[in-house]
Amino acid sequence: MTQVTFKHNPVTLVGTERKVGDKAPNFTVVNRDLEEVTLHDYDGKVRLISVVPSIDTSVCSTQTRKFNEEASNLDNTVVLTISVDLPFAQKKWCAAEGLPNAITLSDHRDLSFGEAYGVIMKELRLLARSVFVVNAVGEIVYTEVVPEGSDHPNYEAAIEAAKKA
C-alpha cells in the first residue's frame, strides 16, 4: 500500500489499491444536484479522475482548475473531480471559480469511490490526493497517489496518459 502523509503526518489509506492494468471498479457518488452518478455513466469515454481532499483549498482548487482547462482540449475525455465535500459546497465553489461545467462529485455518503480505489485517509475521513485515468474500455491506464497531501499531482503525466488512452 502506498505511504501517504497529510500535512507531513502519516495517514492510513483504506480500500483496495489500484494499479495500471486493473479493470476500473464502478462506484456511486453524488453530483451537485444530489443525483447519483456512477463511473459507468461515462462508459465509452476516457475518464480522468481527479481526487482532492477538499475542493475549497488552494492546491485542490488549482488541481481542479488545471485538469479541467487541460482536458478541455482532449477528444472523448471527461474530467471527474471527486472529494468528500458536500455537493452544496462543490456547487458554490464551481460558481465562485467560474467553472460551471466542471463535473464535481461527492463521495460523502458512503465513500464508495474511496473504498474502491484505496484512497480513504482513515484518520481524517478524507480522500487522498490522487489521479486515475481510465480508458474508454474501462481499464486503468494511469495512477498517482500523491505522497504528501499538500503537494500537487504530476499534471503533465496524467494529461499525457489521457491523450494516449
Curated annotation (Swiss-Prot):
Stored InterPro entries: Redoxin (IPR013740), Thioredoxin-like_sf (IPR036249), Thioredoxin_domain (IPR013766), TPX (IPR002065), Tpx_CS (IPR018219), Tpx_Peroxidase_subfamily (IPR050455)
Recorded GO MF terms: thioredoxin peroxidase activity
Catalytic activity: a hydroperoxide + [thioredoxin]-dithiol = an alcohol + [thioredoxin]-disulfide + H2O
Residue ranges annotated for the Thioredoxin domain, each copy included: 18-164
Disulfide bonds: C60-C94
CDD domains assigned: PRX_Atyp2cys (cd03014)
Protein keywords: Antioxidant, Disulfide bond, Oxidoreductase, Peroxidase, Redox-active center
Keyword hit for Oxidoreductase: yes
Active site residues per record: C60
Catalytic activity, EC: 1.11.1.24
Pfam families for the chain: Redoxin
Enzyme class: oxidoreductase
HAMAP family, A to Z: Tpx (MF_00269)
Function recorded in the entry: Thiol-specific peroxidase that catalyzes the reduction of hydrogen peroxide and organic hydroperoxides to water and alcohols, respectively. Plays a role in cell protection against oxidative stress by detoxifying peroxides.
Note: The active site is a conserved redox-active cysteine residue, the peroxidatic cysteine (C(P)), which makes the nucleophilic attack on the peroxide substrate. The peroxide oxidizes the C(P)-SH to cysteine sulfenic acid (C(P)-SOH), which then reacts with another cysteine residue, the resolving cysteine (C(R)), to form a disulfide bridge. The disulfide is subsequently reduced by an appropriate electron donor to complete the catalytic cycle. In this atypical 2-Cys peroxiredoxin, C(R) is present in the same subunit to form an intramolecular disulfide.
Assembly and binders: Homodimer.
Family membership noted in the UniProt record: Belongs to the peroxiredoxin family. Tpx subfamily.
Protein name per UniProt: Thiol peroxidase
Organism field: Listeria monocytogenes serovar 1/2a (strain ATCC BAA-679 / EGD-e)
Species classification: Bacteria, Bacillati, Bacillota, Bacilli, Bacillales
